[in-house]
From Swiss-Prot:
Source organism of this protein record: Escherichia coli O139:H28 (strain E24377A / ETEC)
NCBIfam families registered for this protein in UniProt: PRK03784.1
Protein name per its UniProtKB record: Vitamin B12 import system permease protein BtuC
One BP annotation, GO: cobalamin transport
Matches recorded under InterPro entries: ABC_BtuC-like, ABC_transptr_BtuC, ABC_transptr_permease_BtuC
Keyword list, A-Z: Cell inner membrane, Cell membrane, Membrane, Transmembrane, Transmembrane helix, Transport
CDD domains in alphabetical order: TM_ABC_iron-siderophores_like
Principal place of residence: membrane
Location relative to the cell: Cell inner membrane
Entry similarity comment: Belongs to the binding-protein-dependent transport system permease family. FecCD subfamily.
Encoding gene per record: btuC
Length: 326
């Protein structure tokens, strides 16, 4: 038994090391790649100072943090709701952030600064989170809370559809680009949003013990002495914050929160002491690579990153599911 535990521990360490190396390589590629390839030796030249430090670095950091936040949010939701299909958009938090951002665009007639749009997106996500917490205080079961989140997401989606239908052509273009996700407008002015993600990310990565209990199911978690009501509220609030900030930075990005935790579990990373940091590393790597593809796929334009993540990730996910089912 001790030998098996040591083997599993070594395997987990190898996985984390491999994911760390992958993230560093993806980070390096993201800083080098673009309309002009700039190797690390040229980063401190006048050209590198402009393209790398002023344009690519803030975008790369935003992609890294959003990828980590979405993947960790997916892992938390899948444990909290005991559902492998749970992901950040399932509770309606992503759509709530979208409603806040769309309201800001329409009411501000496209004149509001980026920081105001970001605050409105976070406010929309937190409003949906507060509604979910109110449901949770009624001691609803996890399945009922999940259904409540789905219903809120449908309502928010309907509101966004109505807003797009009645918007002007200029607003419509901005809204449609946001709904497909993208980091094209990110620069150092959004650094406050990036900083808002870091404390919550680090805190959740340290909560492996309650997450492991939650993954066993509600009944087992209660028997082990976990204050289920408290942890459900705290984790829903933390997830709402991360998703709201991510939407404010990059818009709606699917796939990452659903597939990354699932892929790591299929690879044997089931302990949340390893799964949570693994999700952060893998989510950041996947979104960095998708962002590079989005930038380089077309010569004269940039692809929406949400389209890239779905196109590249879905076949890999299906292959892993088929492989695991044999």
């Amino acid at each position: 038994m001790l030998t098996l535990a040591r083997q599993q521990q070594r395997q987990n360490i190898r996985w984390l090391l491999c994911l760390s190396v992958l993230m560093l390589l993806a980070l390096l590629l993201s800083l080098c790649a673009g309309e002009q390839w700039i190797s690390p030796g040229d980063w401190f030249s006048p050209r590198g100072e402009l393209f790398v430090w002023q344009i690519r670095l803030p975008r790369t950091l935003a992609v890294l943090l959003v990828g980590a936040a979405l993947a960790i949010s997916g892992a938390v939701m899948q444990a909290l709701f005991e559902n492998p299909l749970a992901e950040p958009g399932l509770l309606g938090v992503s759509n709530g952030a979208g409603v806040g951002l769309i309201a800001a665009v329409l009411l501000g007639q496209g004149q509001l600064p980026n920081w105001a749009l970001g605050l409105c997106a976070i406010a929309g996500a937190l409003i949906i989170t507060l509604i979910l917490l109110r449901f949770a205080r009624r001691h609803l079961s996890t399945s009922r809370l999940l259904l409540a989140g789905v219903a809120l997401g449908i309502i928010c989606s309907a509101l966004m559809t109505w807003a797009i239908y009645f918007s002007t052509s200029v607003d419509l273009r901005q809204l449609m680009y946001w709904m497909m996700g993208g980091f094209g407008g990110v620069d150092w002015r959004q650094s406050w949003l990036m900083l808002a993600l870091i404390p919550v990310l680090l805190w959740i990565c340290c909560q492996s013990r309650p997450m492991n209990m939650l993954a066993l199911g509600e009944i087992s978690a209660r028997q082990l002495g976990l204050p289920l009501w408290f942890w459900r509220n705290v984790l829903v609030a933390a997830t709402g914050w991360m998703v709201g900030v991510s939407v404010a930075l990059a818009g709606a990005i699917g796939f990452i929160g659903l597939v990354i935790p699932h892929i790591l579990r299929l690879c044997g990373l089931t302990d949340h002491r390893v799964l949570l940091p693994g999700c952060a590393l893998a989510g950041a790597s996947a979104l960095l690579l998708a962002d590079v593809v989005a930038r380089l796929a077309l010569a004269a334009a940039e692809l929406p990153i949400g389209v890239v993540t779905a196109t590249l990730g879905a076949p890999v996910f299906i292959w892993l599911l088929l492989k695991a089912g044999r």
